[in-house]
Curated annotation (Swiss-Prot):
This is 3-demethoxyubiquinol 3-hydroxylase. Its EC number is 1.14.99.60. HAMAP family: COQ7. Binds 2 iron ions per subunit. Belongs to the COQ7 family. Catalyzes the hydroxylation of 2-nonaprenyl-3-methyl-6-methoxy-1,4-benzoquinol during ubiquinone biosynthesis. It comes from Burkholderia thailandensis (strain ATCC 700388 / DSM 13276 / CCUG 48851 / CIP 106301 / E264). GO terms for molecular function: 3-demethoxyubiquinol 3-hydroxylase activity; metal ion binding.
């Protein structure tokens, strides 16, 4: 059984890196049609932002996989799995949007995935309360990051905006779930380190 789970998670990891993840929910659609075509500069900027969001979802898959295997609680395993499935939708949605924008995922996805997997292993080994606290803080920072993207996306890019809005709603839910399950607040140095690492990732992934 464990071997089957390892094969399944390995497959998920490969799909995350390759950008061929499955979606269980359709791509969110805007309520109204775009008011105008995006200019070349707007398409390039939107693609950079969506590439950053795609990298975030690659990292989310790695984090949840590591945390799922680190816990001995069947309830928490299911919680991490449920969150990972919803994040896999995000991964597929952002990949779909990048293709629509004639762009591509980050060339550094294997590196992002490996780094996030290592962080998830460390968080998981510190115990369930810390692991859940790490999940909650991650989701809070992602929520803030998505808020900034909603303000930065071109006004005419209603397709990307619809995706980001649904992603944000899911992230808020995941963060609350982690807190309700017993996640503790991480110390300020840990939160600052997470923000610094996120800044490096987002600044790099926008271009690469």
């Amino acid at each position: 059984m464990l071997f089957d789970e390892l094969i399944s998670e390995f497959d998920r990891g490969l799909r995350s890196i390759a950008g061929v993840s499955r979606m269980s929910r359709p791509v969110p659609q805007p309520a109204a049609a775009a008011p105008a075509e995006l200019s070349a500069a707007e398409r390039k900027h939107a693609a950079g932002l969506m590439r950053v969001n795609h990298v975030g979802e690659v990292c989310a898959q790695a984090l949840y996989q590591a945390q799922k295997f680190a816990t001995s609680s069947s309830e928490l395993k299911e919680m991490f799995e449920h969150a990972a499935r919803e994040e896999e939708d995000h991964l597929a949605w952002t990949a779909h949007r990048l293709k629509d924008l004639d762009s591509r995922p980050s060339l550094l996805n294997p590196l992002w995935y490996a780094g996030a997997l290592a962080i998830g292993v460390v968080a998981g080994r510190l115990g369930d309360k810390v692991s859940l606290g790490f999940m909650a803080e991650t989701e809070r920072q992602v929520e803030s990051h998505l808020d900034s993207h909603l303000s930065e996306l071109p006004a005419a890019d209603v397709e990307s905006r619809a995706i980001v809005e649904q992603m944000r709603a899911d992230e808020v839910k995941h963060g609350k779930t982690a807190t309700d399950a017993g996640g503790i607040e991480l110390p300020m140095p840990a939160r600052m380190l997470m923000r610094a690492a996120s800044k490096v990732m987002t600044s790099t992934a926008y271009y690469l």
